[in-house]
């Protein structure tokens, strides 16, 4: 836990940015571009104490647990004692709780999913606020897979644009008309290739050229 994942580029990735093993992570200002390729993934939220903010997700095609965004149902409570840890599988999903998801942008994605996955531990104290969802050529892509997520999640002042100005009919989402150029300007927020990646990997010139081309 306590990881910071900030200002990275995920391009045509079939692997997601997943908060699974650990708590209190910061997922901030990342760019995820799926280019409409099959089974591309976005951000999957499980466990507790995360902040997910200012991320840009575009043309991701996955659904359910592989959607552009997913808040997953939990299988276990967060362990508190040594006995809890011994009884729990390492790959388990803890209840999602105490999470802020705010100021993110989703463009032309197939689905944003709330409540998918096996398990009966619904989220608690989760806020999805001030996010932008732009999919003008499709019907509303916000899917509530499990209604027991309420009242554990609150949607606050989110803005969306769908085909024919159709509404998702979920409290906390407002229909609007976006300036697409302003929306897509956020895809350039990833840092320069020289500043990307792990501290132990030196970026080669060929990698710099490729990453720069992807962002233009």
Question: What would you call each of these model-derived segments?
Answer:
Residues 1-195:
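Glycine- and acidic/polar-rich repeat regions and solenoidal domains
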Residues 186-216:
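Active-site and glycan-interaction determinants of carbohydrate-active enzymes
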